[in-house]
Design a protein with these regions (language model features):
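Active-site/ligand-binding-proximal alpha/beta "capping" segment
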Residues: 250-303
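Short beta->alpha connector loops at strand-helix junctions that form conserved
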Residues: 131, 152, 179, 205-206, ...
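Extreme N-terminal basic, low-complexity initiation segments
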Residues: 2-8
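RNA substrate-binding interface of SAM-dependent RNA methyltransferases
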Residues: 94-97, 167-257
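N-terminal positively charged helical leader segments and presequences
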Residues: 8, 16, 20-165
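Structured adenosyl-cofactor binding patch, chiefly the S-adenosyl-L-methionine
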Residues: 90, 95, 196, 214-223, ...
Length: 321
């Protein structure tokens, strides 16, 4: 069958028009499919980076040991304005030091706690009941016996004040110098021994030693409230100053003269060294006497607080005779 030129042109136009239409439809469908696939794939993508990202407002995980709040995984620095333990709080209330609050463990209202609460109420001091866990955190692990107090920090004195306390009492000065004692239980026990022996003051270094923490106050059983305390920059310089004030320096060290063969009829400063290192070389060189406690058993050393009690009680008796 023949076809005219005009007919051929019409068929070609129709063919190309259909092809263009089909191509456009296919292109549109492919574009839509790609868009859908891209959108779908994006919904499965993880956030940028390989680690877990907390949501908005979430707190980041702390590194181990990074929590420094009371009760966290790292103990807080022990404050010096917290007094813990029944005897310590009772003596605190007698001492005249300003007390802000008394904290009592919930349910503990018997024995000496009752006396403490009654005295606090009489003095107008708020008494607050708290959980035992809060007391533990507040006292940084001290043996608080269900009670603690928030008080003004103990006021430190200078060396001259300690010596003047002895003169005002008409007594020969007896001062305890703690050269780097780091264990709070030991320091608390030394303070307790010193007060019982009638010592007039304690000298502590500002660095490389424990401060007057809740554990120290608890271990002192209230003796700290009746003891003058000087905190010095340098123990060796403090020893030199005490010598200028008329005191003789007695350092407790192994290998010295037995303490009972030494003349204590004078103003005396007794130096007790740290648990591990003992007395520093410079302090030893500045000492007038090196005294020791003879050992007759198989163990060749005493706890620093035990040694202090032996020497201080002997020194106090000899000063008074």
């Amino acid at each position: 069958m023949g076809i005219t030129i005009s007919g051929f042109r019409r068929k070609c136009s129709a063919f190309f028009a259909g092809s263009v239409h089909n191509y456009s439809e296919r292109s549109r469908n492919i574009s839509m499919n790609n868009y859908s696939n891209k959108k779908f794939n994006n919904s499965k993508k993880s956030p940028r980076g390989t680690g877990h990202r907390p949501g908005y407002g979430a707190k980041p995980d702390r590194r181990p040991g990074g929590d420094r709040r009371p009760g966290g995984d790292m103990p807080a620095v022990a404050p010096e304005n917290i007094v813990s333990g029944r005897n310590s709080v009772r003596e605190l209330l007698k001492s005249g030091r300003s007390v802000d609050k008394i904290f009592v463990r919930t349910g503990d209202r018997e024995g000496s706690i009752t006396v403490i609460v009654a005295e606090a109420i009489r003095l107008g001091i708020p008494v607050i009941e708290v959980d035992g866990s809060k007391l533990d955190a507040m006292t940084c692990g001290a043996h608080h016996q269900g009670v603690a107090a928030m008080a003004a920090e103990k006021q430190y004195v200078d060396l001259e004040t300690i010596v003047n306390i002895a003169h005002e009492r008409g007594e020969k000065p007896l001062v305890v110098v703690c050269d780097g004692i780091e264990d709070p239980h030991n320091l608390g026990a030394v303070i307790r021994c010193a007060e019982c022996a009638g010592a007039h003051g304690i000298v502590l270094p500002k660095r490389h030693a424990v401060g007057l923490t809740p554990v120290v106050t608890s271990a002192s059983a209230g003796a700290l409230e009746h003891m003058a305390v000087a905190k010095v920059q340098n123990i060796a310089a403090a020893v030199e100053k005490l010598k200028e004030l008329g005191l003789w320096i007695f350092t407790a060290e192994a290998g010295g003269t037995p303490y009972y063969e030494t003349d204590w009829n004078c103003g005396a400063a007794v130096v007790m060294g740290s648990e591990g290192q003992g007395v520093s070389r410079l302090v030893r060189e500045k000492s007038d006497f090196i005294v020791s406690i003879p050992m007759y058993g198989k163990v060749n050393s005493l706890n620093v607080s035990t040694a202090a009690s032996v020497i201080l009680c002997h020194a106090a008796r000899m000063q008074r005779t």
